[in-house]
UniProtKB/Swiss-Prot annotation:
Binding of [4Fe-4S] cluster 1, residues: C66, C71, C77, S306
Binding note for cofactor: Binds 2 [4Fe-4S] clusters per subunit. One cluster is coordinated with 3 cysteines and an exchangeable S-adenosyl-L-methionine.
UniProt EC number: 2.8.1.8
InterPro entries in UniProt: Aldolase_TIM (IPR013785), Elp3/MiaA/NifB-like_rSAM (IPR006638), LIAS_N (IPR031691), Lipoyl_synth (IPR003698), rSAM (IPR007197)
Alphabetized UniProt keyword annotations: 4Fe-4S, Cytoplasm, Iron, Iron-sulfur, Metal-binding, S-adenosyl-L-methionine, Transferase
Listed name of the protein: Lipoyl synthase
Subcellular location: Cytoplasm
Length: 322
């Protein structure tokens, strides 16, 4: 299990919205008038299956990024019987002002979480599961061993289930984290770049664009048969050419799968939406992604990193079998 530092009385206190972003380097400045949400930004209403999935998650004491990050696709994904599990708690050590996950000093790791996760996957009869996490800068391996423990637990109870992990950047702990995840590999390795490097100080304080690229390139070199994946949001202030530059950088670092979706502001305390990319422009990005050599490109306004991840990964996983 990942090692943790000594207990702290401030553990477990979660800050959200303006409280969370109060101390970031570049302050969130709201627009005088918000951009009107276009008609193509629409989420599907939940079905009865949605509530059944929520019951299973609560019973197993599991968190999903779908809920914690206020994902607009939660109704559709839960209704299909799919979910992206968020491990290591619901409190992040980073303060990214685009994200709705709470910030603070996280609680100690739950040693039962890998077993609870495996039981949830089995109860939901999932053929494909995505596991992500908050950033855990308080852990000596960034939480890599906990990811590995979760992978092992799922393999034992659901051997036919494919596993994608969406990992943090393991800042300062990359060598040990990659070693652990090479010894217990997923079926797909995902880490998001999120946005253009010129916007990192504003959108991803504490992160580094080149470090994130190197994470995926190094893992691919260690595990050439494991597909690698990354994603970005649009609407934070980037240009179309910035998006193309990111795609070229991804391919130069052997990233095979890409997601691009529209950023939606979770609250007034988060970064504002600076543009809504049209469906036509998303189609252009998709065409350009395939021309650059991505094996799969999920690109559209409502696309998120794990949205329809099972369908996106199917072709890449088939290719790896041959």
């Amino acid at each position: 299990m990942s090692e943790i530092k000594t207990d702290d009385p401030k553990r477990g206190i979660k800050l959200r919205g303006a409280d969370k972003t109060a101390r970031i380097p570049i302050k969130v400045v709201p627009l005088q008038e918000k951009l009107k949400k276009p008609e193509w930004i629409r989420a599907k209403l939940p079905s009865r299956k949605f509530f059944e999935i929520k019951d299973i998650l609560r019973e197993q004491k599991m968190h999903t990024v779908c809920e914690e990050a206020s994902c607009p696709n939660i109704g559709e994904c839960f209704s299909k019987g799919t979910a992206t599990f968020m491990i290591m708690g619901d409190i992040c050590t980073r303060r990214c002002p685009f994200c709705d996950v709470g910030h603070g000093r996280p609680n100690m790791l739950d040693p039962d979480e890998p077993r609870n996760l495996a039981e949830s996957v089995k109860a939901m009869n999932l053929r494909y599961v995505v596991i992500t996490s908050v950033d855990r800068d308080d852990l000596r391996d960034g939480g890599a061993q906990h990811f590995a423990d979760c992978i092992k637990a799922i393999r034992e109870t659901s051997p036919n289930t494919k596993i994608e992990i969406l990992v943090p950047d393991f800042r300062g702990r990359l060598d040990i984290a990659l070693k652990i995840l090479a010894e217990t590999p997923p079926d797909v390795m995902n880490h998001n770049l999120e946005t253009h490097p010129s916007l990192y100080r504003k959108a991803r304080p504490g992160a580094n664009y080149q470090h994130s690229l190197d994470l995926l390139k190094r893992y691919k070199e260690m595990m050439p048969h494991i597909p690698t994946k990354s994603g970005i949001m649009v609407g934070l202030g980037e240009t179309d050419e910035d998006v193309r530059e990111i795609m070229r950088d991804m391919r130069a670092h052997n990233i095979e799968m890409i997601t691009i979706g529209q950023y939606l502001q979770p609250s007034d305390g988060h970064l504002p939406v600076l543009r809504y990319v049209t469906p036509e422009q998303f189609k252009i990005f998709e065409k350009e992604a395939y021309e650059l050599g991505f094996s799969n490109a999920a690109i559209g306004a409502m696309v998120r990193s794990s949205y329809h991840a099972d369908e996106q990964a199917a072709e890449a996983l088939r290719e790896c079998e041959f």
